């Protein structure tokens, strides 16, 4: 027989799953999937390849969510069977505890899958970091953030590649861009965009004073080549230079680095990690396309804010998180108020506590609009 505390955990997991299902409307999703599969069966389905890909990807996402829902339902059935057996055999209690932990994780993942339903949420991501004012201290902070995000991506099983890396003169970085490849990479990271604040006793200060430093993080999705963003070659200035970087497995030092300036907007994109100038140019153009698309989205968002009134809480330009090393240790997200004292784990990439709370928080804001 299971104790009260374990029974309470089971009841909470069941209620959470039931609440999610109410929002999900499984029957509506099944009908939507049937309609999409019907379209995919048409003889002229691939005549418009861009639209066909969008439909195929949407069907794939819905199919996965339905399959995951069925899997959780089956897990609950197995759990109920184990609970019945535990009335006669106490050895099942430990098995039940393990089953409940697995179900809780699956329910949380399922909830996030439903939240990650934006147009580009399933895309790969480009993440850029720039230090704020403050010289070496800020540049060192930017490099700490770079490592944090790379460790997070590796923990997720994502592929990570440094696209651009500009080392600081004394320590740290002047800027860096990484490409993160994996399912929902952009969806997970999109709310990491903003200003990150560090408070610590600076190792670069001989007087051991406490310093506050800032670094900005920007995240954009990898945009499909078929997206309607026109780039006029006459609007581009393309420069080449010798690559420089951190070395190791991430940066291929060659003389083929490319810098592209989009003259009308002033956007500058650099790439130095591919093996040839042509490959670097192609990657830089892809990033430029994504940046221009982001710029267009921001213009539309600004228009919506003017009509609806600005929701300051979801402004990505504000300071979003503080990382305090001294006089105490704490990492706090200023939007969700989620915090932890285990700053070493956070800097080693354990940031899902913040990412998951961000997604749930902003999903709630969208639902109220």
Swiss-Prot record:
It is found in: Cytoplasm. Keywords: Cytoplasm, Methylation, Protein biosynthesis. It holds the Pfam family RF-1. GO terms for molecular function: translation release factor activity, codon specific. SUPFAM superfamilies: Release factor. HAMAP family: Rel_fac_2. This is Peptide chain release factor 2. The gene is prfB.
